[in-house]
Amino acid sequence: MLRTGVIAKKLGMTRLFLEDGRQVPVTVLHVDNVQVIAQRTAEQDGYVALQLGAGEAKAKRTTAALRGHFAKANVAPKRKIAEFRVSPENLVEVGEEIVADHYFEGQYVDIAGTSIGKGFAGAMKRHNFGGLRASHGVSISHRSHGSTGQCQDPGKVFKGKKMAGHLGAVRVTTQNLQVVKTDAERGLIMVKGSVPGSKGGWVTIKDAVKKPLAESTVFPAATRSKAVQAEAAAPAEAAAPEGDN
């Protein structure tokens, strides 16, 4: 059963202290006004998915086509757009806002982002090669990758050979990151360990594909309207008269 993920912005890393005194390194992710922009249905599009938007963009910096797309959904222009495949029963209404409580403490998630670009890198940095010897006749080529193999036949270097080249700035997914803490009021999700990308970069968060979903998972999604209804119901329950003693 697939449910939607969320779009978040990477704010940086810090640490949290657990009740037993242990400290945990966490990456802080900001769920910034994530709203449903469009639905993709099997009848109309051939697949089932939700299109989400996050952040805020200036209208004058948004193309006319996108302005019309956002206006149709009755949402403000967004900085980042992404689609998430979902099950038909987990579609969410257009315009709904998904909050940080979509994930709970202890849950495992998969996070995808664009890794930090490192430019042109040598074989030792890019592929963890050992390099050549420091002495014994080796000059200048200490950090080179060495021979690329082959002879007159086949007379070429095979495709995919590990060599120096561009490193980073590619799509990377880190699996099975544990959610340590969530802050729905500030829209923060704190996950244990590192997350691909630089500070200020956009990432997508999904339920871990290699871990089963817990019974406490919210379906189809944790939305702002549900949170408002829960807040309104809480005072009413507290004010209800108790029975005679």
Curated annotation (Swiss-Prot):
Gene3D superfamilies reported for this sequence: 3.30.160.810, Translation factors
Compositional bias ranges of the Low complexity kind: 230-245
GO molecular function: rRNA binding; structural constituent of ribosome
Record's subunit section: Part of the 50S ribosomal subunit. Forms a cluster with proteins L14 and L19.
Region (Disordered): 224-245
Keywords: Methylation, Ribonucleoprotein, Ribosomal protein, RNA-binding, rRNA-binding
PTM notes: Methylated by PrmB.
Function of the protein: One of the primary rRNA binding proteins, it binds directly near the 3'-end of the 23S rRNA, where it nucleates assembly of the 50S subunit.
GO biological process: translation
Transmembrane segments: none
Modified positions (N5-methylglutamine) in chain numbering: Q152
Family the UniProt entry places it in: Belongs to the universal ribosomal protein uL3 family.
Protein name: Large ribosomal subunit protein uL3
A Pfam entry, by short name: Ribosomal_L3
Superkingdom of origin organism: Bacteria
Cellular component GO terms held in the UniProt record: cytosolic large ribosomal subunit
Record gene name: rplC
Keyword Electron transport: no
NCBIfam families in the record: L3_bact (TIGR03625)
